[in-house]
Amino acid sequence: MDYGLDLEYSFNEFLKGFGLSSEIAHIIWLPLPMLLVLVAAVVGVLVTVWLERKISAAAQQRIGPEYAGALGVLQPIADGLKLLVKEDIIPAKADGILFTAGPILVLVPVILSWLIVPFGQNLLISNVGIGIFLWIALSSIQPIGLLMSGYASNNKYSLLGGLRAAAQSISYEIPLALSVLAIVLMTNSLSTIDIVNQQSGAGILSWNIWRQPVGFIVFWICALAECERLPFDLPEAEEELVAGYQTEYAGMKFALFYLGSYINLILSALLVSILYLGGWGFPIPVELIAKFLNLPINAPLIQVFTASIGIVMTVLKAYLLVFIAILLRWTTPRVRIDQLLDLGWKFLLPISLANLLITAGLKLAFPQFFGG
């Protein structure tokens, strides 16, 4: 399936119409994908924060934000502006360099991970052959930033929160990677594009969630733990650690943690939709739509329609998972730190390893169903 809107090609052709050379058009294009990722991530965070406030209000029989814009849609922007104008404080006995580097080291890998998220056949920033491996590698950097922030704050609550965050992230990253390996084993590829295309054979029935139900559950639990969402928010448990590794942070440094947490949640939901829910896949084949409209499959109208539907389907699937994550936050109690680590090491790790071995066996026995 090599159809779909190619943004880079279309943009370069548009600039060539003004007499610019291919080299200049390519140079102009280079910074745009990263800018597009930043805008998409920030807009996604604003929507998610608004949903969080409204869903939490409904769970507690409240109204939630209603005065800042219609239905309170401007409340997340007001929150961001408030953090933007707050004083940036560095504690007197803190390590200033590490204290500042910590939030950056937490946020940057999460944003870079968006580079491998496809919204269509050609709608992604970087179609690297090792896309999933790159995401796992980038996500392993985050615990360093969390531990660095806790240590540099020179605060016992911050240090304990940083240690908890690092232990939690390491504990759940291994079963998460093993559940992803089962998908890679069936797809024979680390490319996110190939993983989605492999699920396009029979519509919804070819989604990986039917062949990897255990992997799906393990991945989603681990993703929630990596995002430090309830019931796994031990690193910043208010009743125990004030705000964990964020205790001494204020202003934009605190906003970077806040932003990184929500961007990571949206990223995790997008990856679940790509790995297990068919990504941009539409129930009706594009070939039938093109035939119905009596147009070739590479016609501009079909390409725009395919790109639009791909974005809508990917985002809808992702936000369904975000809704579930928000609902879990306001309906489940927090686990203890020993229960958290026991769940990761003694339960999810053996299950994910067994799931990988069973997938390998099923691939040998039923190659037509498990990607022989």
Swiss-Prot record:
Highest rank taxon of the organism: Bacteria
Pfam families: NADHdh
GO CC terms: plasma membrane-derived thylakoid membrane
Annotated EC: 7.1.1.-
Compartments where found: Cellular thylakoid membrane
Membrane topology designation: Multi-pass membrane protein
Spans traversing the lipid bilayer: 27-47, 97-117, 128-148, 176-196, 204-224, 266-286, 308-328, 347-367
GO molecular function annotation: NADH dehydrogenase activity; oxidoreductase activity, acting on NAD(P)H, quinone or similar compound as acceptor; quinone binding
Uppermost EC category: translocase
Keywords: Membrane, NAD, NADP, Plastoquinone, Quinone, Thylakoid, Translocase, Transmembrane, Transmembrane helix
InterPro entries in the cross-refs: NADH_UbQ_OxRdtase_su1/FPO, NADH_UbQ_OxRdtase_su1_CS
Catalytic activity: a plastoquinone + NADH + (n+1) H(+)(in) = a plastoquinol + NAD(+) + n H(+)(out); a plastoquinone + NADPH + (n+1) H(+)(in) = a plastoquinol + NADP(+) + n H(+)(out)
GO biological process per UniProt: aerobic respiration; photosynthesis, light reaction
Family the UniProt entry places it in: Belongs to the complex I subunit 1 family.
Assembly and oligomerization: NDH-1 is composed of at least 11 different subunits.
HAMAP family noted in UniProt: NDH1_NuoH
Function description: NDH-1 shuttles electrons from an unknown electron donor, via FMN and iron-sulfur (Fe-S) centers, to quinones in the respiratory and/or the photosynthetic chain. The immediate electron acceptor for the enzyme in this species is believed to be plastoquinone. Couples the redox reaction to proton translocation, and thus conserves the redox energy in a proton gradient.
UniProt name for this protein: NAD(P)H-quinone oxidoreductase subunit 1
Gene behind this protein: ndhA
